[in-house]
Structures are given as C-alpha cells and as structure tokens.
Amino acid sequence: MKKHSSKTVLALVLFLGLAFGCQQKQAEVKDESNDSSLYQYEGEPLRVAIIGLVHTHVHWILGREKVGDIEIIGIVEPNRELAQQYSEQHGYSMDLVYPSMEALWTEKQPEAVFDFGRIYDHLATVQFFAPKGVDIMVEKPLAVNWDHAQQMAKLAEEHQVELLTNYETSWYGSTYQAKSFVQDTAKVGPISRLVFNTGHPGPIEIGCNPEFLEWLTDPVLNGGGALPDFGCYGANISSWLLEGAAPLRVSCVTRQRKPELYPKVEDEANIFLEYEQSSVQINASWDWSHNRKDMEVFGNSAFLHCLNGQDMEYLPSEEEGRTQLKADALAPGFHDPFAYFVQVLKKGHTMEPYALASLENNLRVVQILEAARISAERREAVEFKELFP
C-alpha cells in the first residue's frame, strides 16, 4: 500500500464524504455556485425514509441543514452498530431505525425513499416500494447491470412513480454553465469532443469505512469497480449534453493497477464513445494522484474546462487566450438532490428530456456501462445497436 504523510491523508479526506463517499468534512474551497443559504421552503415537508446507511453519501442527507422541505420518518438499516454510530454523529433517534423495509412499512408509510444501500439492492428497493406508489431516488449509478435497470424501469412505469438517480455533479454550477455555453454558438456551440477525468486515489486510500468497502469493491454488489463507480459520471453528463444520443460504438480498456488492494475488480477504466459528429472519452480511476471530477468541452474552435463545481477555464480562440470563470449559482430549490426531489414531487417541476436525474438518461448510462464492460472483456470495440437494438 502507498505510504502517505498525515498531511496528505488529511488533504485527501477533507470534505469528500459527499464528493467521494467517505468522511463528511468541509470542502477545502467553498463552492459558491451552490449556496443553500438562499433556499427557503414553504409547505408541507416531503415525508421520506432512508433505505440503507452503507453508502456513505448518506452523510449528505443526515448532515443536511433542516429547512423544512423533507422530514425523515424512518431509516432501514439492519446493521444496528452502524446505525448507532451515525445516530451519535448526526443526532437522530434510534427509534427511527428499522431492520427491514417490511418493518418500516408496517409502522410508517413514507411518500418517498432515498436509497443509500448497495447498488445491487436498488432493484429490491424498487420492487418493494414502487407497487406501493412510493417515489424513489437512488445513488448513482441506477443499477448494476442492464437486466436490473430494465426491471426497475418497468416497475416505475407500471406504478407511475418517479425513479431518479443522484450524482454529485448534478449540483455543480459548472455542469449547467457548460450546457449554456454549448447551446450558445457564439461561445462553444456544437460539441466535437468531451473528456471526463473522474475518480480519486482509491477508496481504501481515502479512508472509506469497512461497510462501504465491503460492497464497493465487489463485482456483483457494485457491478464492478472504478468502471461503474466513476465511469457513470461522464456517461450521465454526456447523455444530457448530447440530448440522449446513443453512441455508435463503445471501446473500453480496464486495468488492475493495485491488485493487492482491489483483487476482485478493476481500479481503472478508459472508455471511448463514438457518435456521429462527436466523441466522448471517460477516464475513470481509483489511481489518480488526487480527487477529481473535471470535464473538458471542445467545440469547433472554442474550449471550456470545468475544473470543479465552480471554477472554469474558457478559451474562445488561440488569439484571445484563456479566461478564468466562476459558474453561476444554482437556483434555490435546485441546488441539491433532496430539494430537487421536492420540486419534482411537491411543486410540479417537469424534468427536461434526458435530465441528469431522469430515468431515461440513467437507462442510457447503464447501457453505456454495460457496453464498456463487454468491450473490456472482449478486448474490442462493440457496436451499440447490436447490444441494444
């Protein structure tokens, strides 16, 4: 295992409980493109339950400021020790904790649930709650494979419930600024190429807890390693920016750079998507030197680099040179996944086609991830239409 100084380890885990799934910390750089202090809510709260605590993005909702838009009425987690630990950290009553979805439903009937369990278990959550008319949001990606995704989508459609998928990058001001630049032909215009660099030094290296590592590094429970964990971000945003277009071909090379740490799964994946007029490159890794989720957008002549949630570099032309930009703030109520879910369920917000959280987008994401996995196994490019006619 790599040796890190205590200073380096501290830097790696600062915040990134939200960003990379381990400790809940404060961000080293305040993201002013996402200011929750402006958010005010009026009306009855959305009564929600949390399904699972083993995905540590759960700290996002447990540590969220109470603004009256959601009310946590129950938590499903069979691991009482973990539930007790988080109870002491966040101050919720253990009376809210139930050992199963059945036990929760006997006493409480939530309007919506947020799934922070294993990706493999997303299907079971939808199978249980969709027939009861309960709306659902899961953590990215939607499902471990295309078979699970199809079953989930069918249930959501049959029972007319929302099935949304949450990504950290959906709440980056820079993500939306990039789309506005693409839509403006005077700024970037039609996309010729997208490049995504996503990941971190590794879940073990950044200090993820055992309950998270147990399934995150399992090929069945997570659907793979770095490929689904960080390949999904680029697949999600590119499907949105390219308005749901399906790639023509998908190529992927996976590696095990640290088999002593991650013997069951790939810790790096390089995905290449070919489209009619553009291409997408996704570099997903648990072996970066640092935490990163950045995006490069190439137009015919202009270039935009989204360095993080708020900082961007814009190159309109070689002659004009680079300009440093800050992303615009997200609108209150559309600044985090929980407020957004309330907007959809309580305030009548209609998602645009292939919206980042939408089911249609995330079905495409699962298709891309599955095609990438097959490409890596075959060691050749795969035709998308042959896999998904």
PLM region spans:
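C-terminal motif of bacterial Sec signal peptides marking the signal peptidase cleavage site
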Residues: 19-21
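Rossmann-fold dehydrogenase core element
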Residues: 36, 151-169, 192-194
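Predominantly a Rossmann-like dinucleotide-binding segment in NAD(P)-dependent oxidoreductases
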Residues: 172-253, 257-261, 379
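Contiguous beta-strand/loop segments that form the cofactor/metal-binding neighborhood of enzyme cores
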Residues: 30-31, 35-42, 234-311, 339-349, ...
